[in-house]
Structure formats: C-alpha cells, structure tokens
Amino acid sequence: MTSEKVETVVAGNYLEMEREEEGSKSTTGKLSKFFWHGGSVYDAWFSCASNQVAQVLLTLPYSFSQLGMLSGILFQIFYGLMGSWTAYIISVLYVEYRTRKEREKVDFRNHVIQWFEVLDGLLGKHWRNLGLFFNCTFLLFGSVIQLIACASNIYYINDHLDKRTWTYIFGACCATTVFIPSFHNYRIWSFLGLVMTTYTAWYMTIASILHGQAEDVKHSGPTKLVLYFTGATNILYTFGGHAVTVEIMHAMWKPQKFKMIYLIATLYVMTLTLPSAAAVYWAFGDNLLTHSNALSLLPRTGFRDTAVILMLIHQFITFGFACTPLYFVWEKFLGVHETKSLLKRALVRLPVVIPIWFLAIIFPFFGPINSTVGSLLVSFTVYIIPALAHMVTFASAPARENAVERPPSFLGGWVGLYSVNVFVAVWVLVVGFGLGGWASMLNFVHQIKTFGLFAKCFQCPPHKA
C-alpha cells in the first residue's frame, strides 16, 4: 500500500500542504519512482531548460542572418533576462494564488493548477478568459511547430518521403503523449531532452568551425527592417517558453523554491544557443536566409544524423510539454480531470491532437511560423499579461502588505518592481507585438505566396534524377 505523508511547510507567509508519495519498497517500485515521479528542484530545472531550447536551436542561426551577429547576441541576452523576469512574476502569482486557496482549505491533490485559474482566482473571470485564450492558442501552435520540426528534420536523413507525409507519420507518433499523466512524469524525458539538445548545440558549433566559412560567404545582415524584427521576434519566442511555468511549479514538491530556477535554466541554455548560432552564421552567412533549419547546410555525416535523431526524440518530448496543459484544459471542460483512470483520460485527450495535426499540414513553414507565433501570441501570453496581472493584483496597499512574496530588495521595493513590469509590458507591446507582428506577418504571407498553403515540401531542394 502507498502511504501519504502530509507535511506543513511554512516559508515566510507561505503555508502549503505538501503530499509526498512513498514508493513501493520493491526494486520495480523504486525504479518507477526514480524514472517516473519527479518533483524536485532539479526536475523543474531540467523541465525548464529542456522545454526552452527545443527546435528553436535550429532556427536561431536563421535569426542571426536576419539580425546580424551583434544584434543576434544582444537580443538573446536581453530577451533571456526578460523571459526570466516574467517567469519569476508568474511564479509569484502562482504562490499567492495557491496560498490564498489553501488557507481556504482547498485541496489540490487531484487537480493541476493552471495559469488561467491563477488569473481567475486573483483577478476574476475576464482575466481568466484572456489568459485561457492566449495560453491555449500559443500552446496549440507551439505543438504545431514541434510537429513541423519533426518533419523538417527527418527529411535530412530520409528524403524518400516528402515533409507532408512525414508530418502525418509524426502526428500519429506524438499522439502517444496522451498517456503521460502530468509533468511529474517527465523526469527521465526532461533529463534526456537536455542531453540531446546539448549534443546538438555543440555538434552545430564544432561542425561549423571545422567546415570553415563557405565560399564567397557574406554577412550582410541586417538589410531590411522586416527581416530584422522577424529575427528579433523569433528570439522573443525562444525565451518565451514559460507558458507551462505554472504546470511545472505545480509538479514540484516545494513550488516556492522555483523563483530562480528559470533564470538558471536560461543561463545554461545560452551556453548552447549563443555559440551554436554564432558559429553557424559565421560559417554560412546569408545562405541561412533561405535555409531556416541550420541542419540543412551542414554536411551529412554520422554526427549530423545523430543530431537529427536526437532532435526528433526531443521534439516528441517538447510536443508533450506543450500539449499536456491543453490536455488538462480539455479534461476540465469535460469534467474528467480528477478521474484516476489513465486510460479514460488518454481517450478523452486524443481529439486535442487532431487540430494540431491539421494546422501543421496547412502551415509547414519551419522558421517563419516561430516569429509569427512569437509576436502575436507569446508577446501577450508570457510577457504582457503576467506583468500587467502582477501590477493589478498588488495595486492596493493591503494587497502589497499581505503579499506572500515581497519584491527583491535590490530592485528598490515595489516601486522598482512596478518599473520593471511597466518596461517589460511597453517594450514587448511596441517592439514584440507591434513591430514584430508587422514584420512576421509580412514574412509569413510571403511564405504562403511563395510555397502556398498545404505546401508538400517546404524549402526542399530539387530531387536529383
């Protein structure tokens, strides 16, 4: 029998009832717990780092060709820090919401808290609806992007099938994520995912340096404002992967320890993205403008094929990360979220995969779609809405006085915190959504005009006779 140990944890004003499971004493039980049941700080770090870097690792050199080397590096650092800030803000709001609810004796043991519920509990139904719309739409297209990336990558190993056919195949494969109950169960997958992207990043870096600069290579970026802001918005998308922050926090045994995890994960991710993007851009320059997937320019070797296979597995994992919150929303809508039957939940989840599959076939534009999603959805989902929600939540003096998490002292208290939130909201609204949205939509429409909807093989080289 599995016994439960309920522990009261007090951290400042934070009171939480934790539930820790004692696994079976058998070898099988211990192995299952080791690989399957994750809730530690390390699990959260692996989840954040693994989920953040994903397929954008392959499109960042493309962004560098649009931005130029200096702007590419600066935007990565800038948006990395900004993303870490809003992830921190989301974590503060989660802790505030959960603390208030647990003081009311609400039990979350069979219920996964999500971002729209945090907004609902703190600010009301209008904020809930806003958060639900942007979060679900972003995660929907985030899943679409992973599916497109699978087809784009496998094509560089096996081009006997076109990318659309590969999308059909991988759509069926990714549908198996319906059997993964929650973020608790991504322990081994998150770890392996980060190992895979680490290998791929350093392969790209070393292979580009060994290849040397291509003949007559040019580094003319930035040349057009449209390309410049498209590239910048892809980087905004890169460091805006924290639409699943609340679900990752909820999977932790001690969610209040999350505060700095995303920043530390981002710093590690930068050790992968900066060298790889810079090296590939140095080697291939403007050629990347027509090759949004960096792997398409690197010579085919066993190392490259290994990178492709590892990224395919990682994209399957990231598909699960993006889709699992959608599964939760759908379960709650149908009233089966708290059922203990895994098979019943899996069957209920299957319809969620169908629109993702369909959209990946309509818009197979690997690279350009990242920027479009970044400007129109990520800008609000993980930057603007969290910053505004935090300011409104703590607008009154009593709310600030009773806040569970106080502002860091080095910021200068509430004034400093509000100043940062205002800057983030205004910057992302003007540069990310405004200029980025304009540029990304122009580029996206250009891809549709060039390749058409339902493109059979986006950016595929002509087949040799």
Swiss-Prot record:
Residue intervals annotated with topology Extracellular: 71-72, 151-165, 211-225, 281-307, 371-374, 443-465
CC annotations in GO: plasma membrane
Localization annotation: Cell membrane
Tissue: Shoots and roots of nodulating plants. Low levels in roots, nodules, stems, petioles, leaves, shoot apices and flowers.
Record topology, Cytoplasmic segments: 1-52, 94-129, 187-189, 247-259, 329-349, 396-421
One GO BP annotation of this record: auxin-activated signaling pathway
Pfam families recorded: Aa_trans
Topology with respect to the bilayer: Multi-pass membrane protein
Keyword entries, A-Z: Amino-acid transport, Auxin signaling pathway, Cell membrane, Membrane, Symport, Transmembrane, Transmembrane helix, Transport
Major site of localization recorded for this protein: membrane
Gene Ontology molecular function terms on file: symporter activity
Transmembrane segments: 53-70, 73-93, 130-150, 166-186, 190-210, 226-246, 260-280, 308-328, 350-370, 375-395, 422-442
Family (UniProt): Belongs to the amino acid/polyamine transporter 2 family. Amino acid/auxin permease (AAAP) (TC 2.A.18.1) subfamily.
Biological role stated in the UniProt entry: Carrier protein involved in proton-driven auxin influx. Mediates the formation of auxin gradient from developing leaves (site of auxin biosynthesis) to tips by contributing to the loading of auxin in vascular tissues and facilitating acropetal (base to tip) auxin transport within inner tissues of the root apex, and basipetal (tip to base) auxin transport within outer tissues of the root apex. May be involved in lateral roots and nodules formation.
Protein name per Swiss-Prot or TrEMBL: Auxin transporter-like protein 3
Organism of derivation: Medicago truncatula (Barrel medic)
